């Protein structure tokens, strides 16, 4: 269910949608992730005698942290959108994210989508939890990325911002309406 739309250039639309899952037709889902790749679902990599907690701890200790602002592309799952994990959090820092890392991750995600010929993607509000960006800053950063993608040329035609609650949807609708009004007033 979408309620508001902001158009960039001649064909990239930013829309608000209610729900955490990508809407029908979305080929990619962009989700938040931390540098150690421990947020979200943990899948079984191999069978061991360790408990799940021990296995995760061992895998985390053995892996190299990812750079903030990067994107990790998940494995293909039949019938589901491809998952792009936007690495925006580092819980060893305070605050754990910043606008620069969110911008870099979103820009990388849209560029990766372009190289894959993706036309539609869903984006969870990455970087807005854990004392990160405000909804207004996130929407501003995403708008900048969409504008850049539209100006430089992209296969992406629709970006859905996936909002978890009706309250959050209402807040983003207000912010998007204000942004649309400001665009009309700009010279």
Model-derived features: positions:
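Glycine-/small-residue-enriched capping loops at alpha/beta junctions
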Residues: 1-115
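Phosphate/ribose-phosphate-bearing ligand recognition and processing surfaces
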Residues: 90-187
